[in-house]
């Protein structure tokens, strides 16, 4: 779907660029496939604020999306594409031959009336799901499992995808959007195609209120605060902070590595940080 550029008929419209959603379903979601969703406001179970910048936003219903795609060898027809407030990608309502309805992540170039299939091995057609070991080398896939049966975890955001680059000893080598190359078990499921709504990143919301509708609060820079409130605070006039970027609690941020998982390090062939090391 294309981007929609608005005319500056008011200050709030100047520079406004949004994704054109005219091709999406305009009604409500399927009630049986929705759940209630309570906003946390960035608070944990003790009421303490653990995530800053989260508050308010429009009330949302959670859509139950099938990330597992384990209903094998049963064709499903795409009824319609829908907006989902819980994710950046669009979702597709599919109807199986036995009448069951389900939501799946909508890949690019999927339209109402298309037939999708999940099987151990199937055609490389957008929306079809199969074991990643059965897909040809070079295939673009998304919604990739990391453990068989757990459901897709990699490449679920708008416009993302994974490319299969090779096979080795029952494992499949894939390249992620970040540049990382890693092994994935060949019996993990994946869905063919790239995720829909690739223009999501090119939107310009044009006004603060539109961010508030999405539940995002303003973020105050550390250098604009007092020394009592942030390690970057204080100084006479405008200062640059004087140290590597840190959080208000002094922990490194903006590119500092936080991954500590020796058990799965062996599956990473090439780190996403490899370019930085040179």
From Swiss-Prot:
A Gene Ontology molecular function term for this protein is: rRNA binding
Among the GO biological process terms of this entry, one is: cytoplasmic translation
UniProt keywords, alphabetically: Ribonucleoprotein, Ribosomal protein, RNA-binding, rRNA-binding
Specify one Pfam family. Ribosomal_L2
Function description: One of the primary rRNA binding proteins. Required for association of the 30S and 50S subunits to form the 70S ribosome, for tRNA binding and peptide bond formation. It has been suggested to have peptidyltransferase activity; this is somewhat controversial. Makes several contacts with the 16S rRNA in the 70S ribosome.
Q: Which NCBIfam families match?
A: rplB_bact
Give the family, as the similarity comment puts it: Belongs to the universal ribosomal protein uL2 family.
- The protein in question is named Large ribosomal subunit protein uL2
């Amino acid at each position: 779907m294309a981007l929609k550029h608005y005319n500056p008929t008011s200050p709030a419209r100047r520079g406004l660029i949004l994704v054109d959603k005219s091709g999406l379903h305009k009604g409500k979601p399927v009630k049986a496939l929705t759940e209630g969703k309570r906003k946390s406001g960035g608070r944990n179970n003790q009421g303490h604020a653990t995530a800053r910048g989260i508050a308010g936003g429009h009330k949302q219903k959670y859509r139950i999306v099938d990330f597992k795609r384990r209903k094998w060898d049963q064709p499903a027809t795409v009824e319609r594409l829908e907006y989902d407030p819980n994710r950046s990608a669009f979702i597709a309502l599919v109807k199986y031959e036995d009448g069951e309805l389900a939501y799946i992540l909508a890949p690019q170039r999927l339209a109402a009336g298309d037939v999708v299939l999940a099987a151990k091995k199937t055609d490389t057609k957008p929306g079809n799901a199969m074991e990643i070991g059965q897909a040809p080398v070079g295939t673009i896939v998304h919604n990739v499992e990391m453990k068989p049966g757990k459901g897709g975890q990699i490449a679920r955001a708008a416009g993302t995808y994974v490319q299969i680059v090779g096979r080795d000893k029952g494992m499949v080598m894939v390249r992620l959007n970040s540049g990382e190359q890693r092994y994935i078990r060949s019996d993990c499921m994946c869905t063919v195609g790239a995720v829909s709504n690739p223009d999501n990143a090119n939107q310009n919301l044009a006004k603060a209120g539109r961010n508030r509708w999405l539940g995002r609060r303003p973020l105050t820079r550390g250098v604009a605060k007092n020394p009592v409130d942030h390690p970057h605070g204080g100084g006479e006039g405008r200062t640059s902070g004087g140290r590597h970027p840190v959080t208000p609690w002094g922990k490194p941020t903006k590119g500092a590595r936080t991954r500590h998982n020796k058990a799965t390090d062996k599956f990473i062939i090439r780190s996403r940080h490899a370019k930085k090391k040179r």
